[in-house]
């Protein structure tokens, strides 16, 4: 389990703001954040590739016992978005898509938790990954044709895991 960084949300917000303002130090800050949190990104990728990933609830500890915290997961997903941006900047569309799909898989896994608040967190993570990263931050047009196919296939696979599909695929 990676070490928690209580300042991560603040550092991520500063990094995203630097990119929005086209600050020259933004890439250096992103590189620093990605290196400092490599263990967290590796754990996210490992969990995304588990066939039966879920969040273990410890009911005996009460309601707060090991419930996923929205801020921690939000920070982890934003870290994954930074990794995807970095991969795109290096021309690696497929690696960028894999980071985004890892994020979406985390959201999907949380949707299967029997606690409403946690399920809503899962929805938020999927939304951040698909809408915020791909649309608002302009990643979608930067993906290669192979990256787009990989993204479509990955989202279709994730959609099939949901009780009520979000996507409709024709043909």
Which functions belong to the PLM regions below?
Residues 1-171:
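Aromatic-rich surface patch/π-platform used for binding flat ligands and interfaces
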């Amino acid at each position: 389990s990676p070490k928690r960084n209580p300042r991560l949300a603040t550092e991520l917000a500063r990094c995203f703001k630097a990119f929005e303002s086209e600050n020259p130090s933004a890439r250096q800050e992103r590189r620093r954040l990605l290196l400092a949190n490599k263990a967290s990104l590796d754990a996210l990728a490992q969990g995304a590739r588990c066939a039966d990933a879920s969040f273990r609830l410890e009911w005996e500890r009460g309601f707060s016992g090991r419930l996923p915290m929205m801020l921690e997961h939000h920070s982890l997903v934003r870290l994954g978005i930074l990794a995807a941006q970095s991969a795109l900047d290096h021309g690696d569309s497929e690696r960028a898509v894999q980071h985004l799909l890892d994020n979406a898989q985390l959201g999907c896994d949380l949707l299967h938790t029997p606690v409403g608040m946690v399920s809503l967190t899962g929805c938020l993570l999927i939304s951040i990954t698909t809408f915020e990263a791909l649309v608002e931050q302009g990643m979608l047009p930067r993906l290669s044709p192979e990256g787009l196919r990989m993204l479509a296939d990955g989202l279709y696979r994730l959609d099939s895991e949901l009780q009520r599909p979000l996507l409709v695929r024709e043909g």
